[in-house]
Amino acid sequence: MSTICPPPSPAVAKTEIALSGESPLLAATFAYWDNILGPRVRHIWAPKTDQVLLSDGEITFLANHTLNGEILRNAESGAIDVKFFVLSEKGVIIVSLIFDGNWNGDRSTYGLSIILPQTELSFYLPLHRVCVDRLTHIIRKGRIWMHKERQENVQKIVLEGTERMEDQGQSIIPMLTGEVIPVMELLASMKSHSVPEDIDIADTVLNDDDIGDSCHEGFLLNAISSHLQTCGCSVVVGSSAEKVNKIVRTLCLFLTPAERKCSRLCEAESSFKYESGLFVQGLLKDATGSFVLPFRQVMYAPYPTTHIDVDVNTVKQMPPCHEHIYNQRRYMRSELTAFWRATSEEDMAQDTIIYTDESFTPDLNIFQDVLHRDTLVKAFLDQVFHLKPGLSLRSTFLAQFLLILHRKALTLIKYIEDDTQKGKKPFKSLRNLKIDLDLTAEGDLNIIMALAEKIKPGLHSFIFGRPFYTSVQERDVLMTF
């Protein structure tokens, strides 16, 4: 790492985090704009290592760089700007989220950033969306925290007359620490256990001599079908790391290379935590043979998820995209409302409770059986196991199958665009679409719609959203009688 001259500034508070394995992250920082001194760093989080790659002064210099030029920032209220810096001369990349907030009695500009070596650029890019989503929600909670702390400190000043304004907002740091550590742990686990970009089909179930050698035929069909219906997002749990990882690799065959790099294998010694935003992840059960998925993280996943248990051969799935996004937004709003109404730091720090209010009570039974059968995956499995294993034939046949799915998804998108004049008119008939595109099987339609959703986000809500919202409103009205 090249030498950087740190600015003459007072020492910045720092928290060192003990992580298992190698951490690709150099540091995370929380900075703010001081109207007199310019950009200043409030806190640094860094992995605890024997070798210091960046000094505190260097980290401070880099973090200050993210707020340079933000003095004239004129963003909408509540806006969060994502900045991506590649500083080749310094050998680092910086991902910074810039936002406005109230602290020390004044409205100012803040930056929450993570710093990585430039050599980790290819590793980080597939995980960029995951990290930005995490940091964005941290900022949502941080804004509420800062505002509440400011109100409390102002009350202390009025009542006691002894508090100083400079101390306001200090307790936001413990809250940020509790939120930043999981992001650092996620990146460390992905560094050591991410799924490789190229998967050898010999390490998957598709290399078996016959269907059913490694797992039951119906289980494999349901697992792959539901995996595709939930936009390629699945969590695989079990007691054997080898068995779990074999299913993880099998499901990752149906993902793009970039999506595979955003998937994680199971750790043999101990189980990782569930992480929202990953496409496929393997998790070990505990000594009692159970595994509990955290409700909050599952709800915050960008796509619905398939739950696969390799011990008992069960496959469950969440509701489709439009329903998942609807529930996710209501839950997020409910959580932030509860955070705002909290009367103590213990309540504000509580992250495991299920938030409810008068208008929304989340359904804890979010996983359901695979209700809709398909013909696409069934035909693929029937044919692929007729090919001789151990050769490249099955890999080629899989590539052809994925190409067909992609073409069908593009055709569906064009069909909807032409029928609605690119969204200017409401969609007329789902029945005609299913007949014209040969998607009469409900499972086939779900698979192609899920793939089309990734190509053109929002398509699910455009087609299914209005009748779903209407049914929800009708249900709410009926429940009032």
From Swiss-Prot:
The keyword GTP-binding does not apply. Expressed in postnatal cerebellum and cortex (at protein level). Neuronal expression is detected in several regions of the adult brain and spinal cord. Prominent expression also observed in embryonic and early postnatal neurons including retinal ganglion cells, sensory neurons in the olfactory epithelium and in dorsal root ganglia, and spinal motor neurons. Expressed in the developing cerebral cortex, cerebellum, olfactory bulb, hippocampus and spinal cord in the embryo and in P0 cortical neurons and astrocytes. Also expressed in non-neuronal tissues such as kidney and tooth. The keyword Nucleotidyltransferase does not apply. Keywords: Autophagy, Cell projection, Cytoplasm, Cytoplasmic vesicle, Endosome, Guanine-nucleotide releasing factor, Lysosome, Nucleus, Secreted, Synapse. Residues 200-343 form the cDENN C9ORF72-type domain. Residues 23-194 form the uDENN C9ORF72-type domain. GO terms for molecular function: GTPase activator activity; guanyl-nucleotide exchange factor activity; small GTPase binding. Signal peptide: none annotated. GO terms for biological process: autophagosome-lysosome fusion; autophagy; axon extension; endocytosis; late endosome to lysosome transport; negative regulation of exocytosis; negative regulation of immune response; positive regulation of macroautophagy. Residues 461-481 are annotated as: Required for the homodimerization of the C9orf72-SMCR8 complex. Disruption phenotype: Decreased life span. However, another report did not observe any effect on life span. Lymph node and spleen enlargement phenotype accompanied by macrophage infiltration. Severe inflammation also observed in liver. Increased total white blood cell count due to a significant increase in the number of circulating neutrophils. Significantly reduced platelet and red blood cell count. Increased levels of autophagy and lysosomal proteins and autophagy defects in the spleen and liver. Impaired activation of MTOR/mTOR. Massive up-regulation of the cell surface receptor Trem2. Residues 370-464 form the dDENN C9ORF72-type domain. InterPro entries: C9orf72 (IPR027819). One of its GO terms (cellular component) is Flemming body. It is found in: Nucleus; Cytoplasm; Cytoplasm, P-body; Cytoplasm, Stress granule. Component of the C9orf72-SMCR8 complex, at least composed of C9orf72, SMCR8 and WDR41. The complex is formed of two protomers, each individually consisting of one molecule each of C9orf72, SMCR8 and WDR41. The protomers homodimerize via an interaction between C9orf72 (via C-terminus) and SMCR8 (via N-terminus). Within each protomer SMCR8 (via DENN domain) acts as a bridging protein between WDR41 (via C-terminus and N-terminus) and C9orf72 (via C-terminus). The C9orf72-SMCR8 complex associates with the ULK1/ATG1 kinase complex. PANTHER family: GUANINE NUCLEOTIDE EXCHANGE C9ORF72, GUANINE NUCLEOTIDE EXCHANGE FACTOR C9ORF72. Acts as a guanine-nucleotide releasing factor (GEF) for Rab GTPases by promoting the conversion of inactive RAB-GDP to the active form RAB-GTP. Acts as a GEF for RAB39A which enables HOPS-mediated autophagosome-lysosome membrane tethering and fusion in mammalian autophagy. Component of the C9orf72-SMCR8 complex where both subunits display GEF activity and that regulates autophagy. As part of the C9orf72-SMCR8-WDR41 (CSW) complex, functions as GEF for RAB8A, and RAB39B, thereby promoting autophagosome maturation. This is Guanine nucleotide exchange factor C9orf72 homolog. It comes from Mus musculus. The lineage of its organism: Eukaryota, Metazoa, Chordata, Craniata, Vertebrata.
